[in-house]
Amino acid sequence: AGDQAPVEKAVMETFVRGEKIRTDRREEGFGICEKLGNSLGETVCQITGQITCEEMMQELEFGKTEFLVPGKEMERELKKLHPMKTPEYIPAKDKVTTVEAICLGNLALVGVKPELNCKSGIALRTFSPYRHTLVCTMVNGGAKYMAERDAYDNSKYEAMNSPFGNGAAEILLRKALGLLEEMKG
């Protein structure tokens, strides 16, 4: 994710012999934003150049499904989160989450509130019945991370800093693919 492994940084903090050093590139930050925006724009143009309509009279379709996923207690003080061999995941009440989709021709836009990890996004694109599937997170609100099973098994940050329990991402993937299959007909 760009917030965890950015291509470039305008402001950064490093430690030298235990002392925190803050570097602020100030005005250069605007150049970084412009460069990243241009890169994003070029990628969008490349993708849109590949989108075709098989039938000229296709209709825009909207779909939505709501379902429950396992919940878990979440540490509110992020400074308390740190690597550990076996973090304690305390189950909480199941959470309602939503998958929304807009489909036209061979293009599907899939929107979810949680921040999905790359594995979930790639799986959704790979198994989608649509040739082009764009996965959008934090749609109609945000809901923190929704990590895959291995993130829980390997004590990754996304699992520790999540209101969702182990298995939630896999349920969301199945529900999203089911919605797309239903919309594809």
Predicted segments, located by residue:
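Non-catalytic substrate/cofactor recognition surfaces at enzyme active-site rims
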Residues: 1-185
